Structure formats: structure tokens, C-alpha cells
Amino acid sequence: MATLTYEEALEILRQQIKDFEPEAKMEEVGVVYYVGDGVARAYGLENVMAMEIVEFQGGQQGIAFNLEEDNVGIIILGSETGIEEGHIVKRTGRILDAPVGEGLVGRVIDPLGNPLDGKGPIQFEYRSPVEKIAPGVVKRKPVHEPLQTGIKAIDAMIPIGRGQRELIIGDRATGKTTVAIDTILAQKNSDVYCIYVAVGQKRAAIARLIELLEREGAMEYTTVVVASASDPASLQYLAPFVGCTIGEYFRDNGKHALIIYDDLSKHAEAYRQLSLLMRRPPGREAYPGDVFYLHSRLLERAAKLNDDLGAGSLTALPIIETKAGDVAAYIPTNVISITDGQIYLEADLFNKGIRPAINVGLSVSRVGGAAQIKAMKQVAGTLRLELAQFRELEAFVQFASELDKATQQQINRGLRLVELLKQEPYNPIPVEKQIVLIYAGTHGYLDDIPVESVRKFEKELYAYLDNERPDILKEISEKKKLDEELEKKIKEALDAFKQKFVP
């Protein structure tokens, strides 16, 4: 066995230490002194930032939610199992962010960006902070392009524009989600990407909804963010912000996106739960004082950007569930005041078989009128008025025995218009067909047709237009307004169809 000389040993040591660089790694840590109900409190972490991700010694993550004088309140992302008093928690220096990019289209993810659809890892372009300041006034442009929902009553009387925030409000089981899903399905042949955020819903209901989107081919342009009823309140609180961040990627790159928050009532409840556990002072209905700011900072991120920034848009359809039709409760009034209008769904109408159960009197679109195509404006201008007059007369008729001819005529027309606006769920109708149908309704083509035959008239009219007069639909699509020549063609087509139609 060869022995090393003193010089050789020295040379080996010299070589070993030549490349050595002393590395000092400093980590700011804290100690957990309380854990329970999805939250933890820790001493230390003196320089932690608000909404910074922190890591527990078992690998679980949390968010610094409350920064107090002597401790930090942390909301735990996921299960609290394995976190105990005395455990070390350390800073990561990273603010909560979400993956964004076109790779998320067609995927189902949780609010932390983990895939839930079994289709492998998420392909994304970069990660973006979930809390962002909304675009300022100078960066915006007034809403002027239509976002077609495929729902006759909405496209005609409560039009929605790209970049608008339109609230869908109503009691449970009145068809709120159906209106939102119809709007997603109506984007099939457009350039709009869709994001559906499910907050606090049953997993079975979410699974049914994803299956429907896949069956209709809508998952090709849709991303679903899921925080179900069985997920912790922390994930339910984060889900809308994550969905919004995904939508902003499209908006900021000159594209168009639609986001649905289903629903913000459960989102507010999750935030209330976290705030009360953090000992924040409760206000009205035990919600914290900043619950208005919670929703306003989220919904203000939906915008139509100006041409210098690429003219992209993010349209938001938040959903609010009311209790027994009480729209004057705290959260409904908050969100009504933040949004640019509301679609009010009524249980009474739903139970009468008027579906979608939209109360046209209470529903309004404050900015959508500027986005509605001129052809629809021309045919639907009198529709709202005729329906309002019909509702008044309907109440009056209950007490009056004899009616004059004009009143009877108005009631007959109203009954047919109500029937005309009924629609099967998950069956969006192209706006060109809607225009011809509503033209028929408001110009008396249905007045002598029995009410029960109106739906048959509608179905056969669409088939007639597709097979024999596709030129009319094409012309409406191209011109986007009714001139004398086009109106003449529509009248000729309706006259010809009506002669063939058998009620």
C-alpha cells in the first residue's frame, strides 16, 4: 500500500479547497403556536409580506393573511393534517401566483394550479400574481362589441358587451348556472376563451357540468377552476382570483375572454369564515368590513382595454344566490352596485314554466346597449315595452270583465311574445335567427297562431331559413343592420313560410 508524502497530501487538500466558496443561507422562520379550522398562528416571520406563501416543516403551504404586532395569521392551503404546535414555518419570498397561458385551455384545475382531470401536468407559459391592480381609466375603452349569449331574452333586451360585468342573480334552482353555461356554449364559433370558476358547489354537480361541456365540444376553449364544497375555505376564497388571473392573460394579449364566478355568495361566506377565524371584527351579517372591497377588486379586473394595449377584453358574469328573493341583503346589494347591470331570475316565473325565468322588468344592462348590433336594436326596440304593457294588463285583466279590442289584441300579442322568448336549456341560438324570429313576433306574424304552436313555428322557421333562405342569415351577419332591402327579404320569407306553416 503506497503512502502519501506530506507534499502530496498538502496538494490534494489545496485542490479540494481551491473551489470551495463558503455559502451563508439565511432563512426567516417562525414557530407555530396554534393550528385549527384551516388556520395557523405563528411567532416570528417579522418581515413576511401580506399574501406571501409560507412553508411548514412538513411541506404544506399557507398564506400570510393577518400581519399582527406579535404574530402572523396563516391560512393553510389544503389539509392541516401534520401541522402541529411547535413546528417551524419559513418564508418563501413568493407572493401567491397562478399558472397562465393557452396550455390551460381544456383543463380542469384546482386554485393552486394542480390538474384535476388526469390529463397530465399543466403546460403553462409563466406564473402570474393572483392579486393584481385593475387597469386604470386611461387603459380602458368603452364597451362597444357584443358578446352573444345565444339566449333570446338576453340578447334582445339585456345585451352584454365584451368587457362588461353582468350579474346573474336569483334564488336557488332558478336556472342561474344554466344561463352561464348557455353563454359558454354560444361562444363555440367565436374567438372568446371561457373560464368557469366553481366555488363551494357539490362535486357531483361540477362533474356533470364538465361532462356537458365536453359533450358539447365547449372544453376546447374553456378552463374550469374548481374549489368544491368539500375543499377548505382558503381554496374557495382563492378560486375566483386564480380564474381572473387566467382570464387576464388573454385580455392582456389582445384576445377576448369570458369568466363565470359560480357563485360569489359562497365566496363571500368562505371569506367571512376565514376573517372570523382570524379574529377580524365582524360587521353586517357577520361579514368583515372589507367584503365590498373583496368583490370590487375582483370584478374591476374585467375590462375592455384600449387599442394601444391590444384591445383585448375580459367579460365577467358573477352569480349571486338570493334567499327567498331578497335582493336587498348585504352581498346582493354590494355586487349589484359593483356590476354594470343584472339578469334577475325569478322562482315564480320558473315554476310557471317560463324558462329562462328572466324578470325583464327588474333586469337591466347599463352599458350593453352600446354593444348591441343595430339589427337587433331595430327589431327588439318595442319588445321590452310590449312585454311591460302586457304584464300591467295581465294584472288588470284579473279584475276586469269586459275588454276592448285594442286591449285584447295587446294581451294576445304579449302571450305570444312570452312564449316566443322561452328556450330549452343548453340550446343557444345564433343572433341572426333570433332577429328574424323577434321580427316575426313584433310585426304580428304570430298574432293568429295558437300560443301552444309558437314553439313549433320557431323550430320550423329556423329549419326553413337554414334550408331555403340562408342568404338572409348571411346578409344579417354581414350588414349587422336591417335596411329596406333586407327587411323586404325578411317579410317575403316570413310570408312564404307562414303560408306553408300548419299550426
Curated annotation (Swiss-Prot):
EC numbers, comma separated: 7.1.2.2
InterPro entries according to UniProt: ATP_synth_asu-like_sf, ATP_synth_asu_C, ATP_synth_asu_C_sf, ATP_synth_F1_a_nt-bd_dom, ATP_synth_F1_asu, ATPase_a/bsu_AS, ATPase_F1/V1/A1_a/bsu_N, ATPase_F1/V1/A1_a/bsu_N_sf
Principal cellular location given in the protein's record: membrane
CDD domains: ATP-synt_F1_alpha_C (cd18113), ATP-synt_F1_alpha_N (cd18116), F1-ATPase_alpha_CD (cd01132)
Coiled coil: none
Keywords: ATP synthesis, ATP-binding, Cell inner membrane, Cell membrane, CF(1), Hydrogen ion transport, Ion transport, Membrane, Nucleotide-binding, Translocase, Transport
GO CC annotations on file: plasma membrane; proton-transporting ATP synthase complex
Entries under PANTHER family matching the protein: ATP SYNTHASE SUBUNIT ALPHA, MITOCHONDRIAL (PTHR48082:SF2)
Subcellular location: Cell inner membrane
Chain residues that bind ATP: 170-177
Reactions catalysed, as given in the entry: ATP + H2O + 4 H(+)(in) = ADP + phosphate + 5 H(+)(out)
Known role: Produces ATP from ADP in the presence of a proton gradient across the membrane. The alpha chain is a regulatory subunit.
Source organism: Aquifex aeolicus (strain VF5)
UniProt protein name: ATP synthase subunit alpha
Source species taxonomy: Bacteria, Pseudomonadati, Aquificota, Aquificia, Aquificales
NCBIfam families assigned: atpA, PRK13343.1
